[in-house]
Amino acid sequence: MLYIELAWRNLFRNTRRTLLTCLLISTGLAVLIFADGAIRGMEKLMIGSVTKTLQGEAQINRLGFRDNFDVDLYIENPTTILGKLTEDERLSAYSLRVLSGGMIGSAYNSAGGVIYGINPEQEKEVSRIRDAISEGNYLSGKSRELLIGTTLADLLEVKLGDRIVLTAANVDTNELTQDLFRISGIFEFGAREFDEGFVFVNLSAAQKLLGMEGGIHQIVLQFKDPKTSRDNLSLSYQDLEDKEIEITGWLGLQPSIGAMLEYTNLGTAIIGGILFILISLGVINSLFMSIYERIYEFGVIRAIGTSRFEIISLVLVEAFFLGLLSAFLGLIVGLLFSYYYSINGLPLGEMEVSGIMLGNGNLYTELAPYQVIFLPLYVILLTLITAIYPAFFASRIVPTRALQRAL
Amino acid sequence: MKVIETSNLSKHFGLGETRVSAVKNVSFEIEEGEFTAIIGPSGSGKTTLLHLIGGLDSPDEGDITLSGEKIAHMKGNQLSDFRRDHIGFIFQAYNLIPVLSAAENIEYIMMLQGIKKPERRRKVEEILETVGLTGLGDRRPAMLSGGQQQRVAVARAMVSKPDIILADEPTANLDSKTGMKLLEVMKELNREFKLTFVFSTHDEKIMNMATRLIHLRDGSIERDEQK
């Protein structure tokens, strides 16, 4: 106990120096907690924006469909797959889709685009289509309803209730087929690609248009735990897969996001590395100054019988207290900042990833238990590791030389 | 009973032309309960000899036997432990740990010896009374006078029940009156507990009080005088 008290009191021999070192280490930890929160927030924002907008967390498609969106590569009978999906407790929702390129025409103009056939009820759970409706209503299931993007509506000079003719190729005969729809809603995702190139109709209407009764092109999956879709899905759905079907998680669907996430992880590692250097230099400087100031005293306590191990322990306990104080201070400051921005958000401006607007333009930091437990422990451990060299230096002080130097 | 026995003790510093022999072929014996002063002019090798006897430095030649154990070739923890259990040190500049109270400074060495806290506290109270510092145990060194600090150093040196106490110019930083009082305390301890003291000093008061004077000149014993 006296030993611990001695180490604690030694820390406050030079209060200003200790506080400055504490400030350095705690600022480092606060920055680490905040940066980690911001990086995790950005990761969540990117994944959320990409997966929740339209793409989903994972997709089931016919093998090769995603390469060219060939309409004839469709799943003729999804019953077996749907049976498996219903049994999967990890899933929170799924939605069936038909999609095809086609001509979208009004009385005044026409444009090429992508026709999505969706199940309105299922789709609510896996995408933001319903939330993106800016005028009119979401699909109710009536056969001739159509949702159109704001930019495309302007181009075609149409408004709610106007007629739209969709022209596409029959999946089996490749013959052109047409059907008439009425605009029931206008959506605005904020992403150019979506707002000027996509229309949504009911699944059955799209199936009828393309001549694929009961068939689908895509099943979009949403999991209870979003991390599930990062895992190797093809393994977990192995019995579903055959040569005809592929299951792809969002990392596979958007490899660019995966690369960005790797960069964010690299960012955390770089910040951690810089902090390591800063903290190391601060701690080494502080401890060496403290040891040099007490060199005579170390000589005396060595002379009266303190072993090298006890000297090492004394310096390490001092470093531990320094790390503990700094970690406590840094934790409070870091958490306060991170908490504030987790509520109020950091303004990002209009930032897009893969053509998708990131959230509402704000980045919300993410608080996580490991930031409270592991990051402070990392800092304490770092302080201790850095203190090893000064501790060994102190233990090697030769009493006679120390006594002579001081005299 | 012999507490210290040195034979042909030599210690050199530097190499070649700059080589200096701080201690040369020094041999003497000190019996238990002696109050010995090693005296001589500056540079005569007093402090080096004291460091060699105390196991703070190792001789280049010769042997030292302390309480029956040869210490010249002891190293590392063995030597630290030996110093802790057999030798008490008093330095010129008091050298108390400034962040510990007087009582804690005395307690420190007992903590190194692994003595339990209640026992340590009891001994500290006893020894504070012995050196005339009753009631001052809670004070930090900065709140004590030079004489009081040196008394704490004496208490720290003797609390581990060493076989010998080595004191390097213990009165050098004290005024003559305080120095005299401190010497009286040490003499009393020498008489009452048969504690063996070896001083390195210029101080005439110590020389007058010592029962034996070892005169050093240029690292060698010039005269060994029993009083």
Model-derived regions, located:
Chain A
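C-terminal membrane-exit region of the final transmembrane helix in multipass inner-membrane proteins
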Residues: 367-407
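Hydrophobic, regular-secondary-structure patches
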Residues: 33-114, 137-142
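Hydrophobic alpha-helical transmembrane segments of multi-pass inner-membrane transport and secretion
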Residues: 15-42, 262-297, 320-329, 378-385
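Hydrophobic secondary-structure segments that place a key small or acidic residue at a functional site
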Residues: 97-98, 113-118, 132-204
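Transmembrane alpha-helical interface segments in multi-pass membrane proteins
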Residues: 288, 297-342, 382
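N-terminal Sec/SRP start-transfer signal
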Residues: 1-33, 43, 48, 52, ...
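Mechanotransmission and gating elements of multispan inner-membrane complexes involved in transport
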Residues: 170-268
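Short helix-loop junctions at transmembrane helix boundaries
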Residues: 328-375, 388
